Amino acid sequence: IIQTRAINSCIQGTKPVIVATHMLESMIESPIPTRAEVTDIANAIREQADCVMLSGETTVGKYPIECVETIQRIAKRIEEEDKQVLRKDLILNLSRSKMLRSAAYLAYDLEGSLVVFTRRGIFAQKLSSLRPNVPIYAFTDKPVLFKQLLIMRGVEPFFMEFDHDHE
């Protein structure tokens, strides 16, 4: 319950949320996760965390590659089951936020994707918080922002130089 509240609070505040609590601890010594660990990962994905993170499992564990493959397989399966178009509980007060929600609905209806050009990441972050069931492609010319965009749910960042000519 506490994890769910924390995740929802972060999403409401358009803050990325990472769940990292010994996700596959048993895989430090064993090539197969416990049922409880699989359930914990599945729940974090269902609760719409931006990402789940491994730590000791990959740094000191005997099966680091299997850990990454396992968490990826679980995440992919749960995300495929998610048929929700957008988070409807997200409160949008600004007209530009409502515009982003409309764009997300349109992209979903057209089976398309969303493209954002960003120097600060605000629109990409807001779109990610809506949790649209379409890809978000974010282009930036800032290396630090590129790395920040990597952890946002549904966002695939691209680094590119922007033209500074305003014509």
PLM segments and residue spans:
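Helical hairpin unit composed of two closely spaced alpha helices linked by a short loop
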Residues: 1-22, 26
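Charged helix-capping and loop-helix junction motifs
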Residues: 1-4, 33-39
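Long, charged amphipathic helices and adjacent flexible linkers at domain junctions
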Residues: 12, 71-104
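Hydrophobic faces of well-ordered beta-strands that scaffold small-molecule active sites
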Residues: 17-20, 45, 52-54, 136
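Short, ordered loop/turn segments at secondary-structure junctions
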Residues: 21-32, 50, 56-60, 119-122, ...
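Conserved, mostly hydrophobic/aromatic
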Residues: 22, 44, 127
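Glycine-rich phosphate-binding active-site loops on the catalytic face of alpha/beta enzymes
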Residues: 40-64
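Nucleotide-binding motor/catalytic cores of P-loop/tubulin-like NTPases across gene-expression machines
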Residues: 123-125, 131-166
